[in-house]
């Protein structure tokens, strides 16, 4: 039996049933999975039992896994894998919901990751969902006067943005050198689908290039308020063994904090080498 792709909502997201990335997939199955990511933006491959090194190998089906910037979050024998936990090592085991504000991965880099793969290792009994926003749909729905204000603008993305509301891991000197400030277009075109999306990141955008803080903050706040509407969202309820893949070029996401923080939530994450947004 081959892999079956099933939509999970009308907004975005699908699940793939019947594939085992550990034992391998055929070229046609790989192409079907890749196309499902392009078509649905978020793809959940169910029932995957993958070690960190197997996760890296599976990730290579969709692109080139990249070594994670922050050394403290890497798995030693698989540096492409970072640990996303509600007990970050840098906090000495103190509970924390990481990434609970809307964002897209890696936008503080000149070539942000194309895809992120997140594998469920340990889940709370209930809650701990991940929510996603379809940024194609956001751009399409923007009122013409607001869309006209955004056309041609670029935003400055920083690892430590003055507007960031989330906990951010401290960088080493070497890591700071590897993550200088960058700027990206606020509307980008997806190289595979040819579609345009609103490319914003509340965690990392510091200001609109060439604008003063007051004017920049006002427009960004307006865009964020519009983008955060439930009509653009899909909420993923994790199951053991889920491998969720999303496209950072046309989505935002956040972790949900509606669960008992005494229960561990541990994920293994791989991001794929990116490209300059255009």
Residue ranges and their predicted role:
Residues 1-243, 249-278:
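Non-heme Fe(II) oxygenase catalytic core, chiefly the N-lobe of the double-stranded beta-helix
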């Amino acid at each position: 039996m081959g892999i079956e792709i099933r939509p999970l909502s009308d907004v975005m997201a699908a699940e793939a049933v019947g594939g085992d990335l550990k034992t391998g997939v055929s070229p046609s199955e790989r192409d079907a999975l890749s196309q499902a990511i392009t078509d649905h933006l978020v793809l959940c491959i169910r029932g995957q039992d993958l070690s960190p090194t197997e996760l890296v190998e599976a990730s290579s089906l969709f692109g080139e896994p990249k070594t994670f910037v922050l050394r403290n979050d890497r798995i030693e024998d698989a540096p492409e894998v970072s640990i996303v936990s509600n007990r970050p090592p840098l906090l000495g085991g103190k509970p924390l919901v990481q990434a609970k504000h809307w964002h897209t991965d890696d936008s503080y880099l000149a070539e942000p990751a194309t895809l992120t793969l997140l594998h469920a290792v340990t889940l709370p009994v209930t809650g701990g969902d991940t929510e996603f926003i379809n940024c194609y749909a956001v751009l399409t729905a923007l009122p013409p006067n607001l869309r006209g204000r955004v056309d041609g603008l670029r935003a400055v993305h920083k690892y430590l943005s003055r507007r960031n509301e989330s906990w951010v891991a401290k960088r080493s000197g070497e890591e700071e050198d590897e993550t200088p400030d960058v700027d990206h277009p606020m509307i980008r075109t997806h190289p595979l689908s040819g579609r345009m999306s609103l490319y914003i990141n509340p965690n990392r955008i510091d200001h609109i290039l060439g604008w003063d803080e007051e004017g920049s903050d006002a427009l960004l706040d307006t865009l964020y308020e519009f983008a955060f509407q439930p009509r653009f969202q899909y909420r993923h309820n994790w199951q053991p063994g889920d491998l969720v893949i999303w496209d950072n070029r046309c989505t935002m996401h956040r972790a949900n904090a509606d669960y008992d923080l005494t229960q561990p939530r541990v994920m293994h994450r791989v991001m794929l080498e990116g490209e300059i947004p255009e």
